[in-house]
Amino acid sequence: MRLDKFDLAILKALQDDARASLNDIGAAVGLSATPCWNRIKRMEREGVIRGYTADISPEALGFMDTVIVHVTLESHSDATLYEFGRALAEIPEVLEAFLVSGDYDYIIRIAVRDTRDYERLLRERLYRIPGIRHSKSGFVLRSLKQSRLPLSVVAPAA
């Protein structure tokens, strides 16, 4: 989908505040509410906008630690990769999982309450997934940057 300067401005406004009113978005991008609404609906239909979420503080809900886990599998068969991905999808604490190139097969981001909670998750969930050869974990000490898509570097369609 080709996005013009108005589409990109709408996306930026929604990234900044997905709860902004159509009037506020229109004022920010230089359009009235109806054209904004039509553009938003088109971007939703075409999959540019995948949904709207709330940015919830993990700490406010007791998830005090984030763990980054690197996993190497025994096999790289389609069946093994599929089964590992399916098993990860069933673990609620897994926030993100990436199949990657390099020394490891997967990088996983996990939210846990504390080290005991992580140890429990390892024993009861992660290490019960068949096919894991090796894993390496690191606790995040501090998050240095969390950001959204860099819309400022996207060139608008003419």
What do these predicted regions represent?
Residues M1-A158:
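A compositional/biophysical signature of low hydrophobicity enriched in polar/charged and small residues
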